[in-house]
Amino acid sequence: MATSHKSENSLLFEWLSEYWHNLLFQLDDELAINTFESRMAKDVTIKINHDHVPRQVYFEYITGTRAAHDLTLISQKQLKVWEAPGGGGSIAYEGELMYNDKKTGEKQTGSVVMIADIRKGDDGNFTIVQSTEIATR
């Protein structure tokens, strides 16, 4: 039977935390691109603040944000998780981060609540197949 967790961090939380670290918070652009390409399904459905966002537009947003800002993770937590019997599942995630503008040095705090549906493929790897984000900055 599938399990639902509230307070302990799940395998999905650990996987999603690593995804965000590799995508936004480390300095290697190639690692960020490879992380996006390998962990974001080609046919992913993405919504940010009520707008549907195509995968390519989301990718450009991520790479543009990386180019313009140094990003620091302030906090993150798992809000709720459902783990599918064969792997994958759904997770509600909350994160807070600092944007430091590379040109001006201006700092802003941002936050996101994300609900991600994650599938385990035949190869055993996880991919995000659907993401809904409420993001503020």
Outline where the language-model segments fall:
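Short, low-complexity N-terminal intrinsically disordered segments enriched in polar/charged residues
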Residues: 1-38, 42
